[in-house]
């Protein structure tokens, strides 16, 4: 019988390089078991086919997972023109094949232009979006007729990295909720030949623009070699780089951690990251126009060293 895994409090962010073929939740659970972390969450799903950056939040860092979910992201996509599939990627069943027209660089740029900016995008029917409390992919697998939702998304840039028919390589910088599978599908229709994603890699997620990612294999090897789990994680404050920073003295930091409101005309308005005098993050707060700081999310136990 395998020994029972004893989980412990562990706080921080792991920049996982997710492998292809694994769901985001399965990747999270694999990392959580290796780290023996009590609590964990990911910051937005990557398709099973996709690889690349999947920030995983553990312990108190799960309180900022939702903030990272809404961050800007960048992807490298390999697109195959001329074939559509039911999932809009290479994991799906082919639906239709069409001839790929002769395309110049100018043709590609003209076709891509309408997909840059604030656009309306219909999600793939094989997606984790919920309808009636159930993921769309579950309904699709049962053969139900589905009308996937259309949502406004923000695509900041699309760069052509290379084209050799039928393969097209793109780099896409976009906001939260953008489906690169949908972009490939819709681009294929504009070109008149259909398309699907052959491979997809997420390069970065704000604020981790130059991430030092780690694979599950490297994580396992490091832990087997005796590396302390907490040294493999980024501290919570690494995920707070985009917020205005307030540093409180010991007395006011204690009051903030007790949920009390504070007031100072010098506080910057809006959502802020609050730190104690030793640099330990106390939590997130919201400052109103009158300089009143209200606690939103409080971090606890960050100075505790997890048991081995």
UniProtKB/Swiss-Prot annotation:
For this protein, the record's Gene3D superfamilies field holds: Pseudouridine synthase (3.30.2350.10), PUA domain (2.30.130.10)
Q: Does the keyword Isomerase apply?
A: yes
What EC number(s) does its UniProt record assign? 5.4.99.25
Kindly state a single biological-process term from the GO annotations of this entry: mRNA pseudouridine synthesis
Alphabetically sorted, this entry's keywords are:
Isomerase, tRNA processing
**Active site: which residues?**
47
Q: Classify the source by domain of life.
A: Bacteria
Q: What class of enzyme is it?
A: isomerase
* Reactions performed catalytically: uridine(55) in tRNA = pseudouridine(55) in tRNA
Keyword check for Isomerase, yes or no: yes
- Family, as annotated: Belongs to the pseudouridine synthase TruB family. Type 1 subfamily.
- Protein task: Responsible for synthesis of pseudouridine from uracil-55 in the psi GC loop of transfer RNAs.
- What this protein is called in its record is tRNA pseudouridine synthase B
